[in-house]
From Swiss-Prot:
Belongs to the staygreen family. Probably involved in the disassembling mechanism of the intact light-harvesting complex of photosystem II (LHCII) in the thylakoid membranes. Required for the chlorophyll breakdown pathway. Acts independent and upstream of pheophorbide a oxygenase (PAO). The gene is SGR. Corresponds to one of the seven genes studied by Gregor Mendel in 1866. The green cotyledon (i) line JI2775 used in the original work has a non-functional SGR protein (AC A7VLV2) due to the presence of a two amino acids insertion. This is Protein STAY-GREEN, chloroplastic. It comes from Pisum sativum (Garden pea). The lineage of its organism: Eukaryota, Viridiplantae, Streptophyta, Embryophyta, Tracheophyta. Induction: Up-regulated during dark-induced senescence. GO terms for cellular component: chloroplast.
Length: 261
């Protein structure tokens, strides 16, 4: 995944133009060695290049969960983090968020984790994915547009990591790939504080996937029932239905409100 705060000099339009008096933020640098010209790779190329999933860079941790248990019967949560040092992804599969992955000042600064939870609502399975766009410190607010762009670009890779890392589950229950993916973007800025439906998982994990604006987020039953799972009082991600005004702080426990996520 691209670093979400590694390109602070980019403008929010993503395709900046420069006047004759201005210099580009990331000028091309050339080195001459042995008579050859070697042009360095600028950060923009990585930022706007294709998002590619590499299975060899994924580390999977199963923490207190039955690999073969259907998520409609046992809570199943994904916690995905990225190391800028090793370029590796770490995916924890457990019943609750793996907060140990999210500790430390660097993770608090970057906030590039993705957490997700399987939900059964009115008898239908769906995957609810959460991304932190802004809030927490001023840098995240300044670059909220850029962070939203990067999260959208990298989410297909994230979803592929979920499917690959939890391979036994999908082999046993292939119908889960038909489940809708709901993406919750958490931000102090209203423009980026929203919920999007990315369609079925098998489509959402493709780079060309788009949002399905005609679909509405399903609502869980307000009382205990057998068609919704996990129950509201047991949900490992207790966020409100509406992302507006909701706090998303996975390091200290996600959300401050309980709702029908």
């Amino acid at each position: 995944m691209d670093t979400l705060t590694s390109a602070p000099l980019l403008t929010t339009k993503f395709k900046p133009s420069f006047s004759p008096q201005q210099k580009p933020c990331f000028p091309h640098r050339r080195r001459f060695e042995n008579g050859k010209k070697n042009q360095s790779i600028v950060p923009v190329a990585r930022l706007f290049g294709p998002a590619i999933f590499e299975a060899s860079k994924l580390k999977v941790l199963f923490l207190g969960i039955d690999e073969n248990k259907h998520p409609g019967n046992l809570p199943r949560t994904y916690t995905l983090t990225h190391s800028d040092v090793t370029s590796k992804l770490t995916l924890a599969i457990s019943q609750t968020i793996n907060n140990s992955q999210l500790q430390g000042w660097y993770n608090r600064l970057q906030r590039d984790e993705v957490v997700a939870q399987w939900k059964k609502v009115k008898g239908k399975m769906s995957l609810h994915v959460h991304c932190h766009i802004s809030g927490g410190h001023f840098l995240l607010d300044i670059f909220a547009r850029l962070r939203y762009f990067i999260f959208c670009k990298e989410l297909p890779v994230v979803l592929k990591a979920f499917v690959h890392g939890d391979g036994n589950l999908f082999n046993n229950y292939p119908e889960l790939e038909e489940s809708l993916v709901w993406v919750f973007f958490h931000s102090k800025i209203r423009e980026f504080n929203k919920v999007e439906c990315w369609g079925p998982l098998k489509e959402a994990s493709q780079p060309t996937s788009g949002t399905h604006s005609d679909l509405k987020l399903p609502q869980s039953c307000e009382e205990d029932c057998e068609c919704c799972f996990p129950p509201l009082n047991l949900s490992p991600i207790p966020c409100s239905n509406e992302v507006i005004n909701n706090t998303y702080e996975p390091i200290d426990g996600i959300g401050t409100q309980h709702g029908n996520l």
